[in-house]
């Protein structure tokens, strides 16, 4: 029932609707790592038969490829979300894909598709550039390239604009980099864990609020460079 599904979407912060008579241009932005949480979409799957069917179809593909199922990943019994890179990124591919396909069944027709960070893999699948199995395989290659490279660190969100945060990074005596500019009042920085902890103290002393993101690497910073070449080589086979 679409009305029941729409009510559940709204509890998740997802709005579905149309304003006015003119058909709008519809853009879908797929979230990436850091948006995951245990039990994602549990209520929607329980209430929506189409969602349950899609989940089972994804499970069949995952099992054939030797990977854990949707439930194994999302229920997070092993406390791996946010720590295990592959399970965390795969959780976002599964959730992004399921939500997008259900919205399509509800009548959504997207004119533009894009992804935030890892969300580009979900966007590529939604655009049919990747089949589901290819998206999973590319995710695995991406994660192996990251995990096998000598990279440690994380990300911190700062409640300030890029100019302010970039200036703070420049005046800080250790390597901390601007990683994402999410909005005029939210900028994400990345670095090694020890440097990030000191940077948080430094920027908080300037009256700027911070949030440590649930990610295991300093994504979108120069520190990720060792993972680039191995990933590029692996993508050739996808």
Predicted features and spans:
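Short, low-complexity connector segments at domain boundaries
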Residues: 1-43, 79, 97-101, 105, ...
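Compositionally biased, intrinsically disordered low-complexity regions
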Residues: 15, 19-22, 68, 84, ...
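Active-site machinery of serine-nucleophile hydrolases
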Residues: 25, 29-75, 90
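Acyltransferase
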Residues: 53-56, 65, 74-238
């Amino acid at each position: 029932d679409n009305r029941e599904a729409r009510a559940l979407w709204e509890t998740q912060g997802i709005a579905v609707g149309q304003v006015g008579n003119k058909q709008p241009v519809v853009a879908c932005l797929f979230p990436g790592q850091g948006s995951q949480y245990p039990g994602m979409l549990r209520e929607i799957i329980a209430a929506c038969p189409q969602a349950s069917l899609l989940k089972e179809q994804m499970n069949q593909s995952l099992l054939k490829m030797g990977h854990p199922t949707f439930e194994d990943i999302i229920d997070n019994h092993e406390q791996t979300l946010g720590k295990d890179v592959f399970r965390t990124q795969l959780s976002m591919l599964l959730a992004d894909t399921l939500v997008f396909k259900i919205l399509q069944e509800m009548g959504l027709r997207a004119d533009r598709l894009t992804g935030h960070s890892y969300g580009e893999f979900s966007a590529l699948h939604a655009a049919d550039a990747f089949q589901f199995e290819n998206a999973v395989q590319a995710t695995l290659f991406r994660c192996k390239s990251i995990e096998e490279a000598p990279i440690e660190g994380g990300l911190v969100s700062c409640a300030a604009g890029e100019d302010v945060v970039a200036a703070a990074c420049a005046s800080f005596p250790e390597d901390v980099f601007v990683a994402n500019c999410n909005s005029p009042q939210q900028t994400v920085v990345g670095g090694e864990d020890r440097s990030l902890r000191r940077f948080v103290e430094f920027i908080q002393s300037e009256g700027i609020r911070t949030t440590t993101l649930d990610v295991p690497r300093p994504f979108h910073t120069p520190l990720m460079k060792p993972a680039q070449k191995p990933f590029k080589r692996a993508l050739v086979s996808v």
